[in-house]
Amino acid sequence: MSCPIDSKKLEEICLEAAQPVLKASEYDGDKTAEMNQSVIYAVLNALNKETQSYKWIVSSTLVQKLPEDHPSRGVHAAHAACWNCEKDGMTTIKESGEAIDVVLSIMWISI
């Protein structure tokens, strides 16, 4: 099923939530838990304002960008669920900053 929120609106929500992280000029491993938490809660709050007809699940992955002369850092993530394919679904959105990429997985489950 397609997302119950327009894809452009969903992209705006994710970009706005990720902006503070994307503005970072360097990756600070000591702050990643706090950064992830702030992004997730910002997305969840915005989604709940848009519609309360769904339960929302948001996961966030922060990926450190490395210098061009350094080999690319590999990251792999996977999600699976059992649900009603006509009413429930998921999507992934990636936002890129100078030092960090933010990958958000958003799942919706009808109530």
UniProtKB/Swiss-Prot annotation:
Sorted alphabetically, the Gene Ontology BP terms of this entry are:
attachment of mitotic spindle microtubules to kinetochore; dynein-driven meiotic oscillatory nuclear movement; karyogamy involved in conjugation with cellular fusion; microtubule-based movement
According to its UniProt record, which protein family does this protein belong to?
Answer: Belongs to the dynein light chain Tctex-type family.
Which keywords does the record carry? Cytoplasm, Cytoskeleton, Dynein, Microtubule, Motor protein
Q: List, alphabetically, the Gene3D superfamilies matched.
A: Tctex-1 (3.30.1140.40)
Short name of one Pfam family for this protein?
A: Tctex-1
Annotated GO CC locations: cortical microtubule cytoskeleton; cytoplasm; cytoplasmic dynein complex; cytosol; horsetail-astral microtubule array; meiotic spindle pole body; microtubule; mitotic spindle pole body
Q: Which PANTHER family match?
A: DYNEIN LIGHT CHAIN TCTEX-TYPE, T-COMPLEX-ASSOCIATED-TESTIS-EXPRESSED 1/ DYNEIN LIGHT CHAIN
Entry keyword annotation includes Cytoplasm: yes
Q: What is this protein called?
A: Dynein light chain Tctex-type
Its annotated function is as follows:
Acts as a non-catalytic accessory component of a dynein complex.
Tell me if Cytoplasm is a UniProt keyword of this record: yes
Q: Which GO-annotated molecular functions does the record name?
A: dynein intermediate chain binding
Cellular localization per UniProt: Cytoplasm, Cytoskeleton
